[in-house]
């Protein structure tokens, strides 16, 4: 964010999972855990009552396709569960088979609380986006939030939704994601 700053108050960052920069001759497992533990250090620094969520891409696309060590995401997930912090896996880039699994989260065997999805939902044929919400989060919205206003003028366009449904059906029925997993 050095180029433009981040104008939203109360958003903070932790170190990125560039294990190849900090690991040296070490295996990626130890740096993966160490970098994930930066989240716990930040939680303790800020106070756990001030941290609502951890948001990240399973594989960081914006940073140049940065693949984390296998130990990184399970440790992040454990920390989020321990402190009751929402885990948000941004699946806009990793979703819908790009890792050989339906989602990058599946690749790392983690269960996010929220998953923003977009491009892969329609394979880019029409613009569409959504947020997948875990049952325990949606239940809070239902019980505590009353009405959840989320429909805007151009949201839920029938053509984009039809393309998304057809695309997901094709990915599933033609086992395209399975082929990505075995061929690449």
What are these regions (language model features)?
Residues 1-184:
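Conserved N-terminal phosphate-binding loop of PLP-dependent enzymes in the Aspartate aminotransferase
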């Amino acid at each position: 964010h050095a180029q433009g700053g981040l104008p939203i108050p109360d958003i903070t960052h932790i170190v990125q999972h560039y294990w190849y920069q900090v690991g040296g001759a070490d295996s990626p497992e130890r740096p993966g855990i160490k970098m994930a533990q930066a989240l716990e250090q930040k939680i303790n620094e800020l106070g756990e009552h001030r941290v609502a969520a951890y948001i990240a891409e399973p594989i960081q696309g914006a940073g140049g396709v940065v693949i984390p060590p296998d130990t990184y995401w399970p440790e992040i997930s454990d920390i989020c569960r321990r402190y009751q912090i929402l885990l948000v896996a941004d699946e806009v880039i990793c979703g819908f088979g790009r890792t050989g699994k339906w989602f990058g989260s599946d690749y790392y065997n983690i269960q996010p609380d929220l998953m923003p999805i977009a491009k892969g939902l329609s394979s880019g044929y029409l613009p569409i986006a959504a947020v997948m919400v875990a049952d325990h989060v949606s239940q809070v919205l239902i019980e505590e939030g009353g009405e959840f206003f989320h429909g805007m003028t151009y949201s839920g366009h029938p053509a984009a939704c039809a393309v998304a449904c057809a695309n997901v059906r094709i990915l599933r029925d033609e086992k395209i994601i399975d082929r990505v997993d075995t061929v690449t």
